[in-house]
Amino acid sequence: MRAATPRSSLNSSQMAQSFKGGGSPTRSSVSRPERQTNFKVVVRVRPPLPRELSGEVPFQNVVAVNESDQVLTISENIESVVDARGQALATPGPHSSHSFVFDHVYEQNASQKSVYETTARAVVDSALQGYNATIFAYGQTGTGKTFTMEGFNKEGSIEARGIIPRAIEQVFGHIQRHANPRMRFLVRASYLQIYNEAISDLLKPDRSNLSIREDKRRGVFVDGLSEWVVRSPAEIYGLMQRGGAVRATGETKMNEVSSRSHAVFIVIAEQVGH
């Protein structure tokens, strides 16, 4: 994390990775480390999808959440499952479980607001104080990354707003409270995707195969990535929708319209004056 400067940036990323647990401590031996860190890892468990509940194989919940201790426990105890003909679809396994401690664990009914308030608000505050900050959604396809980060559904529910729109509202709320004749703010936004190891500009699709560079003034940046001056949350939402429409998508076994690329939405806020 860098020292405070008049310029700060907030990156919100959507990335995909499978979660795998190896040999890990049991619940009784798990302890929560008490230390300050620049990185925090949180886990959000999503509810089962309708197709998972109505599938041929009965749905089994193997995840237990202890929000008070921030512990996630994965059980490997699989009961015998048979189909309509009496044929075994799964065989019993040894009863065992693995527990993992995180900075925060959210159960499947956690609201978008609670996720933002306990996870993201402090990160945005850091960006507004001049530090670079990143919020990074990590998970297998179909686990709810897009819902957590963007949150908008077909009904446009206000309660369903995700981290990005809530962060934008926080940024512009800060600007409204602190702007005066001696101080003004400049907010810019960019949107990129990484697909097949190539970086392209989602807001200028003709710009592809962009390169990552670094210099003393800008730090790490994507050369040629367009930046758009925005004056309201509505303008940013428009850029998100515009960029999202050209993202690479494709069907997978887990998701009929899976995002096949990694996406990064970047907001840069600059303060001019004192």
Q: Where does each model-flagged region fall?
A:
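Ser/Thr-centered flexible coil motifs
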Residues: L49-R51, S232
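Short Gly/aromatic-enriched secondary-structure transition segments
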Residues: E52-N66, K204-S208
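Short acidic, low-complexity intrinsically disordered linear motifs used
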Residues: Q36-P48
